[in-house]
A protein has these predicted regions:
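N-terminal leader/linker segments that precede catalytic domains of diphosphate-processing enzymes
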Residues: 1-150, 156-253
């Protein structure tokens, strides 16, 4: 069981303010190439995804995350012309991270690339992350955490994971929450992967601002995206991080 964070009150406001202070003092940091894989399985209760609990002493510590991490030089894959293949390299990194962090095997040929996330400039560490999804290969009982970067794991239905965030039991970064929110509509792995395969991968370059209700993450198409002003009129494509309930809006035509 993944343990929840202590001191939940105003944690999103506090985290954003700390990020903003760091940005004011040090400026924007360079993007770090990274990859993650959402490992899925079918159960009698529906689709479940593997959630890992990050060590509180490292980047994104204490949060519920998917297997993943930075892309290493050793992950590099070359195309048929001998040039670096960015997507294949990211997939190789995701496979490696799943094995290292949780002893989980995924088939790189069966993974679906469905999103890429670019963090806002305010973040102190900025991982530009390829998001893949894959069905679990083998026995779910074979999951074994590394007990270093990862301190616990749990299989969760996506809606249960977001509900537990709202209840203060776990913490989720916006890309994780958005992915779980997307997966919550599916009852089986085949349906989720088929829709991801059929759609163009989504690109999220996040802009973030503070409001009285909580931090707001905005993406392209939101009326406040270009000016980084969440009060601007227009369409909404954003996640408002209210303490007891994250609220996603997308009314783009």
């Amino acid at each position: 069981m993944i343990d929840g964070p202590a001191g939940r009150e105003h944690r999103d406001h506090g985290r954003y303010d700390a990020y903003a202070r760091h940005h004011d003092e040090h400026g924007s940091t360079e993007l770090i190439p990274a990859a993650t894989v959402i490992v899925l399985r079918d159960t009698p209760d529906g689709l479940e995804t593997l959630m890992l609990h990050k060590n509180s002493k490292i980047a994104f510590g204490g949060m519920g995350v998917f297997p993943g991490g930075r892309i290493d030089d050793a992950d590099e894959v070359l195309d048929e012309n001998g040039r670096p293949d960015e997507l294949a390299t990211a997939a190789a990194a995701a496979v490696r991270e799943a094995a290292e962090e949780a002893s989980v095997t995924v088939d790189p040929d069966e993974m679906v690339w469905f999103a890429r996330w670019i963090p806002p400039p305010v973040m102190p560490r900025r991982f530009a992350t390829f998001f893949f999804a894959a069905r679990l290969e083998g026995d779910a009982g074979s999951v074994a955490i590394d007990d270093g970067e990862i301190t616990d794991h749990e299989w969760m239905r996506p809606a249960d994971a977001t509900d537990r965030r709202d209840a203060g039991e776990i913490e989720l970064a916006p890309p994780t929450w958005m992915t779980l929110n997307q997966l919550a509509r599916y009852t089986d792995v085949a349906g989720a992967l088929a829709d991801m395969e059929a759609a163009e991968p989504a690109f999220y370059e996040t802009h973030m601002a503070r409001t009285d209700n909580g931090p707001v993450a905005m993406w392209e198409g939101d009326g406040g995206y270009e000016t980084n002003d969440p009060t601007m009129p227009g369409a909404r494509h954003r996640l408002t991080m209210v303490e007891d309930r994250y609220r996603f809006e997308d009314d783009r035509s």
